[in-house]
Amino acid sequence: MSVQRVKMAGIVAALLGSTVAANAGGFERSSQDFDILFEKGNAVEAGGTFVAPQRKLKNIRGSRVGAATGGINPITRQPYETSVDEAKSYWVPKASAKFDLTDDLACAAQYRQPWGIHTDVGVDTVRMFTAIDQKISSNDYGVNCSYRFAAGEKSYFRILGGVSYQELKGEQTKMIPPGSAFGGTFRIGSLDVEDEAVGWRLGAAYEIPEYAMRATLVYQSKLKYNLEGTIDNLAIVGGRGIPINVESDVDTPQSVEFKFQTGIAPDWLAFGSVKWTDWSSITQVDFDASDNNVIRKGTTITSLNLYYQDGWTVSGGVGHKFNDQWSVAGTVTWDRGTSTGLTSQTDVWLFGLGTNYKPNEQFEVRLAGAAGWLSSGELDDTVVNGKPNLTGSKGEFGNDFVGGLSLTAKVKF
């Protein structure tokens, strides 16, 4: 079996993983990457993934605010629409610079955007009373390292670890009805919060390079945030909105991921992975007044009701190298939805295909695509955690298409 030929297919397998991670459950968009540390030599890699989810909500109904307005939208002066395209397309960049410090120690500086979500339902349906536009964005600046020990004549054991500095930002707009605690007329309020945090990860790997066999297990810690910012246009004084300073404690979830690959025939590689993410730790995110300027400090102004269930992502595939320049790989991935009925984040099935072109030993470019569906279901946030939610509503959605495209280039030196 040609080890180098098999390894090329393994590179394509890693590429397809970037397309899958960019549409994972919860609001994860990019997972940690230790694969580059297993390659020999110094390298710089950069690329990105474009994802286009086509989630459409239908038969939207059941809003108490909508009923109170007689079914007439106060903005358009027309009956409320009952369907809307919810999801927005997005781009996820990623970059790494890897260096061999010794024969056994390697480190990589990395940039990625681990968390993100963007939905926009506009102001035509009663969903605007839950949220009009919601956006979470992030930046991660990290370092991952690997130290290798001999574990036999042809095998190695590695200790993997890393740290990251992360920035997290959350934005939301929603329609405020006159019956809110702050009174006033129909108006759009906005939430804008952000914070920074530090996280870590630790893992181990076992490999037999001659057979392109590798198994890795990595734990990623949760990150603790104290989000701070303002809610605007909620409190009205003298005919104008007064910003309310707010804060919220929230943790991004911990996770454990297992990856495995092995050569199965000359120029053929099989690979797979399983990842668990502790999304059930995120239930209700309260935004409380952080001072006494407008309302008593500690008073909950608004909440983000998620009540997620844990996420599971299972992926498998096969790669093949045709010659010294071209390799291909295909994958099948299932991502369990994190929704418990309050959101439209249901199961995702993805089928991926990618190719790796390497014209010489110093440069290679990878292109991968994935297509699949977001599974059907229903959402109902008229009752949250056993309590009536006056601004909630009900809706349905079918099996909707999702597609992704990833492009990456690498230079070795």
Annotated model-derived regions:
Residues 2-11, 16-122:
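N-terminal, post-signal peptide beta-strand-biased segments of exported outer-membrane/organellar beta-barrel
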Residues 1-2, 161:
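Charged interaction patches that mediate protein-protein contacts
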